[in-house]
Amino acid sequence: VPYSDPNDLRRLKVDHAYENSERGYVLRNIGSKYNPSRQTKWIPEITKQDFWQLYMNHIQIMKEKFPKTSGRICSYCLKEYSFMRRLGTRGKGYTGQKGQVQTNFSIDRYDSRLTYKYNNVVFCCVGCNQRKRDSNPNDWNNYIRVGREIGYGT
């Protein structure tokens, strides 16, 4: 069976087409949160179906806020996100952040000290998720306080 060969170009093209669709990209992203090979302490407290429902709700809310858009908008920068993967990445695991498309869809934990659960899941772009990576709400309050103290923006 030619498609059983993971390096078969036909299979790579079919996989690539699916993974560059919104559904394929988002489901792979959600599924990665449950991958047993992930070395993480953040085991989601919600199901894959809950993630999908939260995503659909996010789209609806964004469509209401921005009626002339598709609703596929980053919660942080309010720009539309994309769904693009490189050809031939299926089964390769984590391939590093080099070359990641900054506008791609991503799932963030609002408070990075907590796991994926209701009221802690944010749909955003990769760029915003990376910029927020090493901070938490306490840090943000400190940044705002220091900015006010030094007169930033006045």
Regions found by a protein language model. Name each.
Residues 75-78, 127:
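Short, cysteine/histidine-rich loop/knuckle motifs that typically chelate Zn2+
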Residues 22, 29, 69, 86-94, ...:
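Intrinsically disordered, low-complexity segments enriched in small/polar residues
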Residues 79-123, 132:
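Histidine-centered nuclease catalytic patch
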Residues 115, 119, 123-126, 130-154:
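A detector for short metal-coordination/catalytic motifs
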Residues 2-10, 89-92:
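Short Lys/Arg-rich cationic patches that frequently serve as NLS/NoLS or arginine-rich RNA/DNA-binding motifs
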Residues 10-76, 113:
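Short, charged surface segments at domain edges that flank catalytic/cofactor-binding sites
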Residues 3-4, 43-46, 116, 135:
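Short coil/turn linker and secondary-structure boundary residues
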Residues 4-7, 14, 18-21, 107, ...:
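Intrinsic disorder/low-complexity signal
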